[in-house]
Amino acid sequence: MGMISEFRTFAVRGNVIDLAVGVIIGAAFGKIVDSVVNDLIMPLVGRVIGKLDFSSMFIVLADPPPGTPTTLDALKKAGVPVFAYGNFLTIVVNFLILAFIIFLMVRAFNRMRAAEPEAAPAAPPEEVVLLREIRDSLKTR
């Protein structure tokens, strides 16, 4: 029974709950970034280079068997080696956007933390003040 109570104490500790909330929000945010990349950015890039669907961009590295369709999935199922760079490009763009957004959030957080006023230094103890006064009066003699 001791292990269960230890686990409950661990699980309800603030840091674990904060981490769980962060993971859930991060997963939802990842879906938003995926949508921004797949639905907004990649179609614009595809319009510029002439292809709308990056996932279908690949290079066949060997001759496919006769009668094999030339789609990426069909070639993979047939065991034909393909260099499928389209999906990789989408994931790289996705990563760069996510990394930039996280950078902006951390930067804003650091600026807010730096803007907080620093605590005033603590006043010296009364003994130190008295000793300084004695020192100063001895210097003037």
Curated annotation (Swiss-Prot):
Similarity comment text for this entry: Belongs to the MscL family.
GO MF terms held by the record: mechanosensitive monoatomic ion channel activity
HAMAP family per the UniProt record, alphabetical: MscL
Protein keywords: Cell inner membrane, Cell membrane, Ion channel, Ion transport, Membrane, Transmembrane, Transmembrane helix, Transport
Function in brief: Channel that opens in response to stretch forces in the membrane lipid bilayer. May participate in the regulation of osmotic pressure changes within the cell.
Superkingdom in the source lineage: Bacteria
One cellular-component annotation, GO: plasma membrane
Keyword Transmembrane: yes
UniProt subcellular location: Cell inner membrane
Residues spanning the membrane: 16-36, 40-60, 86-106
Bilayer topology term: Multi-pass membrane protein
PROSITE patterns: MSCL (PS01327)
Known partners and oligomeric status: Homopentamer.
Species of origin: Cupriavidus necator (strain ATCC 17699 / DSM 428 / KCTC 22496 / NCIMB 10442 / H16 / Stanier 337)
Gene3D superfamilies given in the database record: Large-conductance mechanosensitive channel, MscL, domain 1
Pfam families: MscL
Protein name (record): Large-conductance mechanosensitive channel
